[in-house]
From Swiss-Prot:
Biological role stated in the UniProt entry: Cleaves, in an endo-type manner, the gamma-glutamyl bond between D-glutamate and L-glutamate of poly-gamma-glutamate (PGA).
Active site: C194, H247, Q259
One of the protein's GO biological processes: proteolysis
Record's subcellular location: Secreted; Secreted, Cell wall
Gene3D superfamilies: endopeptidase domain like (from Nostoc punctiforme) (3.90.1720.10)
Any matching Pfam family: NLPC_P60
Organism the protein comes from: Bacillus subtilis (strain 168)
Regulation: Inhibited by pretreatment with 1 mM 4-(hydroxymercuri)benzoate, a sulfhydryl inhibitor.
Main location: secreted
Domain NlpC/P60 positions: 33-159, 163-287, 291-413
Temperature-activity profile: Optimum temperature is 45 degrees Celsius.
GO molecular function: cysteine-type peptidase activity; endopeptidase activity
Name of the protein in question: Gamma-DL-glutamyl hydrolase
Amino acid sequence: MNTLANWKKFLLVAVIICFLVPIMTKAEIAEADTSSELIVSEAKNLLGYQYKYGGETPKEGFDPSGLIQYVFSKADIHLPRSVNDQYKIGTAVKPENLKPGDILFFKKEGSTGTVPTHDALYIGDGQMVHSTQSKGVIITNYKKSSYWSGTYIGARRIAADPATADVPVVQEAEKYIGVPYVFGGSTPSEGFDCSGLVQYVFQQALGIYLPRSAEQQWAVGEKVAPQNIKPGDVVYFSNTYKTGISHAGIYAGAGRFIQASRSEKVTISYLSEDYWKSKMTGIRRFDNLTIPKENPIVSEATLYVGEVPYKQGGVTPETGFDTAGFVQYVYQKAAGISLPRYATSQYNAGTKIEKADLKPGDIVFFQSTSLNPSIYIGNGQVVHVTLSNGVTITNMNTSTYWKDKYAGSIRVQ
């Protein structure tokens, strides 16, 4: 069963990647030459730095793939973290066609396979810069070394980062590359976790309000077949730090996704990486969650999201709102309808409707410690006032707190 599941995951990623063959223009080739010079220069500046298993910065030291990832990042080229994953990208280069800036790959001595365990940056004339356990970052002529020439398995040329797609969600996500990972974080100022990044980006780019957790987002999105993936879709992964849906990233095109990585920060990663390939579960699209702003009640209600705090007894944006005060104010302002002041009376002010018949602008009630009214805006979402967040949007079908507190709905006309 596990073998079948893993095979399905492999096919899922393979279908996505097979469409992605980059073609370079003359201008991009010129830019690539400049990038190679920068990468080689950066690598030479790191000569003498110590070896460190898992190291990827000058401060801590470098392992082989950490060094390669670091010097390429200085040219704004984002590489996977492991040797094996770096070997999967770029263009294969024959030994006679090597240029400075190419990456050389080596297998374990005595191995009969072609799995790379070490990589290095080619700098010309048979020489390479790499990080070794015995001497740290050094220059070695691999052609004159029986060890390195005997374990050489190939080279890759990675001239430039593939361009991220020119769609609002991807362009917005790209702004936050480098922002630290913070568990529970959902803004650039505090940092992001994976679902916090997805939620924030969709709100900023498209005005789409997603649930907070990855598993809740997965539940409300539109399922997308791998062959139909497009930039701006969200890719979900399972069994990372917990069982089930547990991680998400925004597909950026060219087989890459932007994510808040628990081990790094907001970064660009490749779906072809062994780790992500084994964890990938599926794809979701959220175009269907666009708020129907043409509805005057919905339009008015969403004006105050994130702008107005909770205030006991509050009935205006200037003072803040309590739960019923918010609903009363929106209906009066948007539709000229005078509702009673308190939730119990509001519940009796309209026509009772079934949950399945809800339309944007209807009033939905939840029973917590008291009766809480909210305004339905479509797609299972409501605008309401909470003590902690003020005016906010909640998906009433996936919220762990509100989904079991549904008490009824009315339509006021």
